[in-house]
Swiss-Prot record:
Active site: D141
Cofactor: Mg(2+)
A biological process from GO: stress-activated MAPK cascade
Chief location: cytoplasm
Locus of motif TXY: 171-173
Annotated control of activity: Activated by tyrosine and threonine phosphorylation.
Modified residues (Phosphothreonine): T171
InterPro entries reported for this sequence: Kinase-like_dom_sf, MAP_kinase, MAP_kinase_CS, MAPK_p38-like, MAPK_Sty1/Hog1, Prot_kinase_dom, Protein_kinase_ATP_BS, Ser/Thr_kinase_AS
Domain Protein kinase, residue spans: 20-299
Molecular function, one GO term: MAP kinase activity
Name of this chain's protein: Mitogen-activated protein kinase HOG1
Length: 357
């Protein structure tokens, strides 16, 4: 049985196994407090995220289960990976992942990025999205603070599938709105992986310009700012809006012409402008895909089709429509955690046997 140690962080009890030491607060992540720690087993620095009261409501339990399933399934160099998970005696859940020194939001607020860094960061974002989308997963809340970077400029996407985007009045970071695709904002009938391409386009523009591209004060203002640059959406796109109120609002807006992006991004090279124009398209079906973006001329310094893997299998979303009581989610979660540790133990045993021969 693991031995647990308690510490108070920002008035919150962190109850972690003795494997981890030197707890330091890093900040609030999605639905939990994040600390850095030293993993005594691997001698590496890690991030430990405490999920607050995961079994307090069915909604929270399901959200935690979804995050656990996604972290277990997604294995890619540009996606954050799970290195440990445990339930404390107080029944809080802790996810342990690799620790990267900073995130893109902090980098962008500290200094302008040089061209080669912008290219390399965008390449890694697209490489990660190609894999994630091939697994049938949509991030839904891509923004600079969800993109982690270390001192070697290695980039990893984190906080997957957590945003409750079905709720257009979603609370949380106000800046989340800046990166949100129009089909989510206008509550169109359905959305898919293309929403992440729009968000990545907004992030790309912010790296080029040094400030958010569409800093809307609210959803109406947000949409207005988008149309100032990209013009009024075409009629066939407007007619896909399911909500009558939203449709009436969009049709009442003055017609606007698309502005050349070159006028706004005067220092960007032509290939950067071309890629950005292909990402920021109103019609999701006409937006460039992650795979296509990787092959674009702008990313050619890093593009290697032999080293841009896809997922071996699709993520199983069958649980997502389930409306289950907390106790059932808890049993399912315990089962996933046991499975994770059995698989990890199996790998370790195999390695020990192999090395012992």
């Amino acid at each position: 049985m693991a031995e647990f140690v308690r510490a108070q962080i920002f008035g919150t009890t962190f109850e972690i196994t003795s494997r981890y030491s030197d707890l330091q607060p890093v900040g609030m992540g999605a639905f939990g407090l994040v600390c850095s720690a030293r993993d005594q087993l691997t001698n590496q620095n890690v991030a430990v995220k405490k999920i607050m009261k995961p079994f307090s409501t069915p909604v929270l339990a399901k959200r935690t289960y979804r995050e656990l399933k996604l972290l277990k399934h997604l294995k890619h160099e540009n996606v954050i990976s799970l290195s440990d998970i445990f339930i404390s005696p107080l029944e809080d859940i802790y996810f342990v992942t690799e620790l990267l020194g900073t995130d893109l939001h902090r980098l962008l607020t500290s200094r302008p990025l040089e061209k080669q860094f912008i290219q390399y960061f965008l390449y890694q974002i697209m490489r990660g999205l190609k894999y994630v989308h091939s697994a049938g997963v949509v991030h839904r809340d891509l923004k600079p603070s969800n993109i982690l970077v270390n001192e070697n400029c290695d980039l990893k996407i984190c906080d997957f599938g957590l945003a409750r985007i079905q709720d257009p009045q979603m609370t949380g970071y106000v800046s989340t709105r800046y990166y949100r695709a129009p089909e989510i904002m206008l509550t169109w009938q359905k959305y898919d992986v293309e929403v992440d391409i729009w968000s990545a386009g907004c992030i790309f523009a912010e790296m080029l310009e040094g400030k958010p591209l569409f800093p809307g004060k609210d959803h109406v203002n947000q949409f207005s700012i988008i149309t100032e640059l990209l013009g009024t959406p075409p009629d066939d796109v407007i007619n896909t809006i399911a909500s009558e109120n939203t449709l009436r609002f969009v049709k009442s807006l003055p017609k606007r012409e698309r502005q050349p992006l070159r006028n706004k991004f005067k220092n960007a090279d032509d290939s950067a402008i071309d890629l950005l124009e292909r990402m920021l398209v109103f019609d999701p079906k006409k937006r460039i895909t992650a795979t296509e973006a990787l092959a674009h001329d702008y990313l050619s310094p890093y593009h290697d089709p032999t080293d841009e893997p896809v997922a071996e299998e699709k993520f199983d979303w069958s649980f997502n429509d389930a409306d289950l009581p907390v106790d059932t989610w808890k049993i399912m979660m315990y089962s996933e955690i046991l499975d994770y540790h059995n698989v990890e133990a199996g790998v370790t045993n195999m390695e020990e046997q192999f090395n012992g021969q």
